[in-house]
Every structure is written in C-alpha cells, then in structure tokens.
Swiss-Prot record:
Record's keyword annotation contains Disulfide bond: yes
Protein name: T cell receptor beta variable 6-1
Subcellular location: Cell membrane
Keyword set, alphabetical order: Adaptive immunity, Cell membrane, Disulfide bond, Glycoprotein, Immunity, Immunoglobulin domain, Membrane, Receptor, Signal, T cell receptor
Signal peptide: 1-21
Ig-like domain span: 22-114
PROSITE patterns in the record: IG_LIKE
Keyword Disulfide bond listed: yes
Protein source organism: Homo sapiens (Human)
The gene coding this protein: TRBV6-1
Length: 114
C-alpha cells in the first residue's frame, strides 16, 4: 500500500461525520443483586410507531417481553412476567425489572419499526 493512499484513508476517517444511532439502549451493561429493581431506557430517532423489548437467554432465540404499537399503548409479549413498560411518547420505551431474579439474567434488546 502506498503512503499516499494510507494518508488519504486516515484523512477520510478524521472527517467522517457521526451516523444516526437509530435505536439507543441505556445502560449498556448492568449487574443487579437479587431483589433489586432497575429501568432500561430505549430511544429511537427514526419516528417509528412500534417499539419492542426482547430478551435472549443463552442458547435461545429472541423472546418478546412487551411491545407498543403507538405511544400510550403497550401489550404483553411471550415473557412479560416480572417486567413493566412505559411508552409516554413516540421516541421512548422503557422496561422496568421490578425485582431482579436469577432467571432474568439475559441479554436485552430494544427495537423499533414502522
């Protein structure tokens, strides 16, 4: 690879603009003791109507916890027990673990769609 090409690539990366995040979940990582509660926040910047919370346990596929077809409405998914949700506006959909249990150790995903 020539020096000219290498410098061009480095320069292009320095001037790259940020990309829209789409869906943002916070916090990214969390460890809880049994019985503790916490809220996972999800925000989307794509003006989508529908939002979803999923969990993925080791060796399993995604399982729907709750979903919302529009702001102010929520419906239970496949595994809603132990969770509550809130969708006060089009952009945000929060998931609350009321009392953490070892069975809730999982990877959590938020998604949105038209």
């Amino acid at each position: 690879m020539s020096i000219g090409l290498l410098c061009c690539v480095a320069f292009s990366l320095l001037w790259a603009s940020p990309v829209n995040a789409g869906v943002t979940q916070t916090p990214k990582f969390q460890v809880l003791k049994t019985g503790q509660s916490m809220t996972l926040q999800c925000a989307q910047d794509m003006n989508h109507n529908s939002m979803y919370w999923y969990r993925q346990d080791p060796g399993m596929g995604l399982r729907l916890i709750y979903y919302s077809a529009s702001e102010g409405t929520t419906d239970k998914g496949e595994v809603p027990n132990g969770y509550n949700v809130s969708r006060l506006n089009k952009r945000e959909f929060s998931l609350r673990l009321e009392s953490a249990a070892p069975s809730q150790t999982s990877v959590y995903f938020c998604a949105s769609s038209e």
